């Protein structure tokens, strides 16, 4: 036999199905999923259950190309909305693939390599397959080391972290009206580490809770200082969905505002469009509580994810931040210019402000309508 491949499949967000319905329904979803996957496999592939919502596919005599073909069929099928017993649900599949003997000299080593690949698929956004490589192993080792360094930093009072403030300018008056608090990390071993790398690690580990509280408190203190010179100044702070999942966030927010003697209207909390578009009842209730405190809510990265106009109607946001991708070449790109103009007009009509990321001063003359 030329080769043996192992694909490990995991059902994305399966826990949400159990939480939304119940475990008995989840068990039926597992059974249906196994049947569907088995029906789509070639004769040289064997399906077995590994653990929980995780399955293994042993591919005899196949290779990564065949594995990718199999996964492509599965992905196409499971991207669609599923239904059972009158209940609808979504459950995509993530996968990791490894081959014998190159990626493991025995079953346990092969399974470990396939699981590392699956882990990478999850980190990269789920609903995809990753083929094992030494780069994935090196990336995993780096992430584990960065996580330990992050823990050390948090224990040492966020040593190595600084907060930079990106100015926000009113395009009509040209006056500075606020700033966004952006965290930067200079790691003792790796130097400057991108937020795109350390923020997901913090979210996965729970470190985002104390980290988010630290940024918000620092931002409030800085806002209070700048308000001495400009009373209408506001500070924007990014909020992670993990923070909202903690039941005591509203309590922390209220206490922090009181401790800094800061008017709630000076704080804008930013949540991504993708998260808000999928917001459930508990999240919407928390957003309503934040607004009752007087804090403003911004929808970040508008235009990147769902771009649902319904979300502008159903979610009471005060500010819509149009993604920076629409700014590039705006003076010569008719679509981008029209998009920004249309969304701005719509937001004004429903009482929300718009903020365009990286909308530099030399573009102001072309867009005095913001």
Where are these regions (language model features)?
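Conserved long alpha-helical elements within nucleotide-processing catalytic cores of c-di-GMP signaling
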Residues: 1-5, 12-42, 48-52, 56-60, ...
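The catalytic core of metal-dependent phosphodiesterases that act on cyclic dinucleotides
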Residues: 15, 254-330, 342-370
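Catalytic core regions of nucleotide second-messenger enzymes
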Residues: 48-50, 78-94, 122, 191, ...
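Catalytic strand-loop-helix junctions within cyclic-nucleotide turnover domains
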Residues: 58-67, 85-88, 93-110, 135-138, ...
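Catalytic-core segments of nucleotide cyclases and related cyclic-nucleotide turnover enzymes
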Residues: 68, 72, 85, 100-126, ...
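C-di-GMP signaling machinery
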Residues: 101, 120-162, 172, 202-206, ...
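Catalytic core of bacterial c-di-GMP phosphodiesterases, primarily the EAL and HD-GYP domains
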Residues: 129, 171-180, 205-283, 358
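Active-site core of bacterial EAL-family cyclic-dinucleotide phosphodiesterase domains
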Residues: 142-201, 238, 299, 356
């Amino acid at each position: 036999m030329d080769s043996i491949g192992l694909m490990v499949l995991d059902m994305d967000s399966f826990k949400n199905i159990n939480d939304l319905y119940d475990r008995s329904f989840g068990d039926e979803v597992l059974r249906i999923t196994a049947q569907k996957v088995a029906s789509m496999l070639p004769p040289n592939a064997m399906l077995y259950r590994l653990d929980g919502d995780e399955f293994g596919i042993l591919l005899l005599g196949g290779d990564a190309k065949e594995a990718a073909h199999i996964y492509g069929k599965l992905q196409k099928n499971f991207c669609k909305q599923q239904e059972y017993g009158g209940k609808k649900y979504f459950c995509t599949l993530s996968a990791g693939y490894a081959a014998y003997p190159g990626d493991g000299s025995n079953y346990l080593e092969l399974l470990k390599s396939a699981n590392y690949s699956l882990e990478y698929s999850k980190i990269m956004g789920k609903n995809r397959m990753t083929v094992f490589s030494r780069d994935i192993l090196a990336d995993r080792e780096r992430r584990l080391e960065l996580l330990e360094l992050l823990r050390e930093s948090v224990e040492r009072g966020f040593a190595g972290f600084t907060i930079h403030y990106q100015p926000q300018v009113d395009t009509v008056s040209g006056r500075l009206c606020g700033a966004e608090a952006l965290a930067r990390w200079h790691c003792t071993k790796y130097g400057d580490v991108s937020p795109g790398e350390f923020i997901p690690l913090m979210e996965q580990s729970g470190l985002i809770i104390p980290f988010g509280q630290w940024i918000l408190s620092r931002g409030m203190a800085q806002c209070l200082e700048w308000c001495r010179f400009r009373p209408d100044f506001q500070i924007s702070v990014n909020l992670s969905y993990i923070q909202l999942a903690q039941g005591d966030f509203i309590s922390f927010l209220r206490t922090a505002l009181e401790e800094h003697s800061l008017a709630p209207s000076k704080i804008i909390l930013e949540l991504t469009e993708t998260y808000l578009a999928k917001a459930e009842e508990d999240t919407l209730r928390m957003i309503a509580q934040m607004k009752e405190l007087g804090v403003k809510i911004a929808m970040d990265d508008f235009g990147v994810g769902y771009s649902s106009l319904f979300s502008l109607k159903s979610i009471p946001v005060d500010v819509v931040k149009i993604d920076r991708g629409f700014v590039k070449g705006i003076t010569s790109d008719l679509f981008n210019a029209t998009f920004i103009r249309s969304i701005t007009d719509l937001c004004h009509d429903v009482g929300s402000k718009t903020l365009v990321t990286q909308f530099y001063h030399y573009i102001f003359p072309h867009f005095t309508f913001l």
